[in-house]
Amino acid sequence: MARIIVVTSGKGGVGKTTTSASFATGLALRGHKTAVIDFDVGLRNLDLIMGCERRVVYDLINVIQGEANLNQALIKDKQCDNLFVLAASQTRDKDALTQSGVEKVLHDLGAMDFEYIVCDSPAGIETGALMAMHFADEALVVTNPEVSSVRDSDRILGMLASKTKRAMEGGDAIKEHLLITRYNPARVDQGQMLSLEDIQDILRIKLIGVIPESESVLQASNQGVPAVHMQGSDVSEAYKDVIDRFLGADKPMRFTEAPKQGLLKRLFGGK
């Protein structure tokens, strides 16, 4: 049975789609057959980050409305044989995203022997976000170390606890993981960002990883490559750690402290 993971946040621009792409890619690189679905009807960015925008013929709404089947709509990733992308529609109304339609798509993906289905949610509490989280078994709650982002993530946790299938049917709670993106320890030390402790005190869910602030994320997006593929970068290493922890490995948390300056830099103010 496929495990369904929603990547969600209350605020836009926190790195949800970047995370969905790297998380799904990381699972596939570990040998797991994985599908990643873009639920952001009308905007559609996942295909750009995955580098497959020119190969989109059919999308999620086409499948839901019976205009195409999954075999026609799924795009096989060029770098991972067991990774597939299902794009969102740029032209359809969000109301075309129905609960019964989403349920059938997820069921059919499970029947195709997918082990993991990653649902890339739009920000906030609109239809796409509700549909992305409704059938989830686990959730990656993505937040930046700033007050507004953390507050909005707290609202999302409330929705996960009340608006999902598991919550409505009184089943086991969705397993929630906190992922902090764009973290800069030096700015935390200067009081410009919330600390890990501050964020965890507010949200009170288990931390699965810290993604450092880095220009390599923008470079990866512009190249149409998931950041996890940016070999040698801190961001790539951080996402690999997240995947390892998700799959049960005990990995120390990295990228949480500012690098110590050497003696010469401290003496002469070098940068």
PLM regions and their residue ranges:
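Alpha-helical segments flanking ligand/cofactor-binding loops in enzyme cores
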Residues: 25, 107, 130-131
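Flexible glycine-/small-residue-rich
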Residues: 9, 38, 87-90, 121, ...
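C-terminal lobe/tail of nucleotide-utilizing enzymes
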Residues: 167-271
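Walker A/P-loop NTP-binding active-site region of P-loop NTPases
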Residues: 4-69, 116
